[in-house]
């Protein structure tokens, strides 16, 4: 999500030397690890505070394990350096679903020990959120969002991506997510072109861009950062938008004339992972199990508007808050989980599918 991913992507676009320097900074602040300790990337700002309140403090109280929180973003380049030098200075890291494939291929992460999870907790976590080497920390989505001044509830408005693409029936200024990172409106373009939701993968890259050709003249801006789409929605500079649900929800909570359409939402999520060679791997496994319990995720989601990966958490979240979250059970039937495995697959050209989309976007957007 924008709170983390935009900053991460910016940093990944800089030199590897910067990444190494950042890791050295983390390591320099860290003393030698001891039994009963753990270093966890929690992130900064309100997200980091929510991670500390919902997970870190109660974990310390329950286990007696002392957690050192890391507010810096930890990049794949840093994780690779830790693995190469056999010096894992951060035990638990949050990464995006687009990074898990590379992390596994490069042997940067440990396997998750699901044997320590209680059955009822595991049953609450859908298969899409469980990976051999990672487990989803939180869930968010890309949605169609209305400017209710242009499209009030009593006026016909698009409810599917095919209707969003229908600019004659539903005129107005549109804004959509840029594909510069390889994470663009690919699934939405195929849905607009008539591909059934359960037949999206493998994505047909030529068909995606043929569909985008049709909507391109009607898109006022292709936004890259969450702050951009939030400002656009705040200013009323678009009638229809392709947006993070969380950015739109923040404005709704502030009384802005914005409404989220949950139909055909694209679900995506971040992963908790354990750094390869972590000297505190056992404690890290305990932390991940703790951080995916329904009770603790329910607390987190009430502090920060990200959906829980353990759907049992919704039994503990007040309904008015629960319905603001992308992973709410009522939205499941009409949502499309992003296929992390497919995006991370490497082709004969040595590129992942995500990288291939990023390259194609650069050519197409010129």
Task: Please state what every model-predicted region is.
Residues 334-366:
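Conserved C-terminal helix/tail region of periplasmic/extracytoplasmic solute-binding proteins
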Residues 34-101:
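Early extracytoplasmic/lumenal segment of secretory-pathway proteins
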Residues 45-52, 88-90, 94-220, 224-234:
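Extracytoplasmic ligand-binding site segments that recognize negatively charged/polar headgroups
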Residues 103-111, 128-131, 250-262, 326:
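Ligand-binding "clamshell"
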């Amino acid at each position: 999500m924008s709170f983390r991913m935009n900053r991460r992507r910016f940093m990944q676009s800089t030199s590897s030397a910067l990444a190494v320097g950042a890791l050295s900074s983390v390591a320099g602040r860290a003393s030698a690890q001891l039994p009963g300790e753990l270093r966890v990337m929690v992130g900064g700002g309100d997200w980091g505070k929510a991670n500390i309140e919902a997970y870190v403090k109660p974990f310390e109280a329950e286990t007696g394990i002392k957690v050192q929180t890391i507010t810096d973003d930890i990049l794949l380049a840093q994780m690779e350096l830790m693995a190469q030098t056999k010096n894992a200075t951060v035990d638990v890291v949050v990464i995006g679903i687009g990074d898990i494939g590379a992390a596994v291929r490069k042997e940067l992460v440990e396997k998750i020990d699901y044997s320590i999870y209680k059955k009822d907790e595991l049953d609450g976590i859908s298969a899409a959120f469980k990976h051999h080497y990672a487990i989803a920390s939180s869930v968010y989505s890309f949605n169609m969002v209305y400017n209710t001044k242009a499209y009030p509830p009593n006026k016909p408005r698009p409810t599917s991506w095919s209707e969003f693409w229908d600019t004659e029936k539903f005129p107005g200024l549109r804004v959509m997510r840029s594909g510069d990172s390889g994470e663009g409106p690919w699934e939405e373009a195929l849905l607009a072109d008539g591909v059934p939701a359960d037949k999206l993968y493998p994505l047909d890259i030529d068909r995606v861009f043929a569909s985008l050709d049709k909507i391109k003249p009607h898109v006022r801006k292709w936004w890259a950062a969450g702050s951009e789409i939030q400002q656009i929605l705040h200013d009323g500079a678009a009638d229809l938008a392709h947006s993070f649900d969380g950015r739109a929800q923040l404005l709704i909570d502030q009384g802005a004339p914005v409404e989220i359409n949950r139909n055909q939402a694209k679900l995506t999520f971040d992963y908790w992972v354990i750094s390869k060679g972590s000297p505190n791997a056992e404690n890290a496994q305990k932390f991940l199990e703790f951080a995916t319990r329904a009770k603790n995720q329910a607390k987190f989601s009430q502090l920060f508007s990200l959906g829980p990966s353990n759907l049992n958490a919704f039994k503990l979240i007040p309904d008015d808050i629960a319905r603001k979250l992308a992973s709410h059970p009522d939205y499941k039937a009409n949502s499309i989980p992003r296929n992390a495995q497919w995006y991370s697959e490497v082709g004969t050209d040595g590129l992942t599918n995500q990288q291939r989309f990023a390259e194609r976007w650069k050519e197409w957007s010129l």
